[in-house]
From Swiss-Prot:
Its cofactor is FMN. It comes from Nitratidesulfovibrio vulgaris (strain ATCC 29579 / DSM 644 / CCUG 34227 / NCIMB 8303 / VKM B-1760 / Hildenborough). This is FMN-dependent NADH:quinone oxidoreductase. One of its GO terms (molecular function) is oxidoreductase activity, acting on NAD(P)H as acceptor. Homodimer. HAMAP family: Azoreductase_type1. FMN binds at S10, S16, H17, S18, M98, W99, N100, F101. It catalyses: 2 a quinone + NADH + H(+) = 2 a 1,4-benzosemiquinone + NAD(+); N,N-dimethyl-1,4-phenylenediamine + anthranilate + 2 NAD(+) = 2-(4-dimethylaminophenyl)diazenylbenzoate + 2 NADH + 2 H(+).
Length: 209
């Protein structure tokens, strides 16, 4: 039995193109794998731990083996719980809209919490090494415009490029993608057609996940 962590990074609910496609993927996967478990983490609804002064100081002090204050202990323990919750999954699905050419701030906050030395990556004289390995991830991207590879517009895409880089940094090598674009620039008819195509693609991909 495998566990999927489904991370929703859009606050738009059913109106979200990225969530609609990811939902279709998860539904098709669950129908094909009824014994597996799907856990949903909506980063806009979740009570994510604050990564403020106490947590930041605790990160450095703990790395040096120095004692922590009670507040620092509590803040760092909350971070480690979030990391362990993330790492207990066997597979991952992410619904991700583009905001200002990048990713929503709540997902960035989530990554800032879980990407920690000794927990999700390590480093030595040879460089950095991801610690979250051997697990596939499916990302459903939605963008208002179109950013095709090999065009000048590709340089504006800090959504897909960032996510693939940060996931690769912590060890992911099997990163699969479904992209819905454009959801705004082409008008509503184009958006609906592109979403329908992406939903069908996601359903097919779910059978091999």
């Amino acid at each position: 039995m495998a566990t999927i962590l489904y991370i929703k990074a859009s606050p738009r609910g059913e109106r979200s193109h990225s969530v609609t496609v990811a939902d279709a993927f998860v539904k098709a996967y669950s129908e094909a794998n009824p014994g597996d478990v799907v856990r949903v983490l909506d980063v806009f609804e979740a009570d994510l731990p604050a990564f403020g002064t106490d947590a930041v100081v605790a990160r450095y002090l703990s790395g040096q083996g120095d004692p922590l204050s009670p507040a620092q202990e509590a803040a760092w323990a909350a971070v480690k719980r979030q990391v362990e919750d993330f790492k207990t999954a066997d597979k991952y699905v992410i619904a991700l809209p583009m905001w200002n050419f990048s990713i929503p701030w709540r997902l960035k906050q989530f990554f800032d919490i879980i990407i920690q030395p000794g927990l999700t990556f390590s480093y030595d004289e040879q460089g950095y090494h991801g610690l979250v390995t051997g697990r596939p991830v499916l990302v459903s991207y939605a963008r208002g415009g179109a950013y095709p590879a090999g065009t000048p517009a590709e340089g504006w895409d800090f959504q897909k490029r960032y996510l693939e880089h940060i996931l690769g940094f912590i060890g992911f090598t099997d990163i699969r993608s479904v992209v819905v674009e454009p959801t705004l620039a082409g008008g509503p008819d184009t958006a609906q057609a592109k979403r329908a195509e992406a939903v069908e693609q996601a359903r097919r991909m779910a059978l091999e996940f």
